[in-house]
UniProtKB/Swiss-Prot annotation:
<protein>
    <recommendedName>
        <fullName>Envelope small membrane protein</fullName>
    </recommendedName>
</protein>
<keyword id="KW-0053">Apoptosis</keyword>
<comment type="function">
    <text>Plays a central role in virus morphogenesis and assembly. Acts as a viroporin and self-assembles in host membranes forming pentameric protein-lipid pores that allow ion transport. Also plays a role in the induction of apoptosis.</text>
</comment>
<dbReference type="GO" id="GO:0046760">
    <property type="term" value="P:viral budding from Golgi membrane"/>
</dbReference>
<dbReference type="GO" id="GO:0044178">
    <property type="term" value="C:host cell Golgi membrane"/>
</dbReference>
<dbReference type="InterPro" id="IPR003873">
    <property type="entry name" value="E_protein_CoV"/>
</dbReference>
<keyword id="KW-1043">Host membrane</keyword>
<dbReference type="GO" id="GO:0140975">
    <property type="term" value="P:disruption of cellular anatomical structure in another organism"/>
</dbReference>
<feature type="topological domain" description="Intravirion">
    <location>
        <begin position="41"/>
        <end position="82"/>
    </location>
</feature>
<feature type="transmembrane region" description="Helical">
    <location>
        <begin position="20"/>
        <end position="40"/>
    </location>
</feature>
<keyword id="KW-0812">Transmembrane</keyword>
<dbReference type="GO" id="GO:0016020">
    <property type="term" value="C:membrane"/>
</dbReference>
<dbReference type="Pfam" id="PF02723">
    <property type="entry name" value="CoV_E"/>
</dbReference>
<dbReference type="InterPro" id="IPR043507">
    <property type="entry name" value="E_protein_aCoV"/>
</dbReference>
<keyword id="KW-0472">Membrane</keyword>
<feature type="topological domain" description="Virion surface">
    <location>
        <begin position="1"/>
        <end position="19"/>
    </location>
</feature>
<keyword id="KW-1040">Host Golgi apparatus</keyword>
Length: 82
């Protein structure tokens, strides 16, 4: 069954529809790529925030604990013999 010739403006064998769908597909892919990049940026911001809020204070506390608990090494010349 063919489409009636009276309703055909340009006989392009579906090229306009094909181009329209390709452009729509390209626009959707571009929007998806932008959304994916924004999700990656959000993950990086959350990682940096977690590092700043959790990791660095814990590291400073651990370094302070290490320096507080550090003892001098045994030196036999300074030892007292009883």
């Amino acid at each position: 069954m063919t489409f009636p010739r009276a309703f055909t403006i340009i006989d392009d064998h579906g090229m306009v529809v094909s181009v329209f769908f390709w452009l729509l597909l390209i626009i959707i892919l571009i929007l998806f790529s932008i959304a994916l990049l924004n999700v990656i940026k959000l993950c990086m911001v959350c990682c940096n925030l977690g590092k700043t809020i959790i990791v660095l204070p814990a590291r400073h506390a651990y370094d302070a604990y290490k320096t507080f608990m550090q003892t001098k090494a045994y030196n036999p010349d300074e030892a007292f013999l009883v």
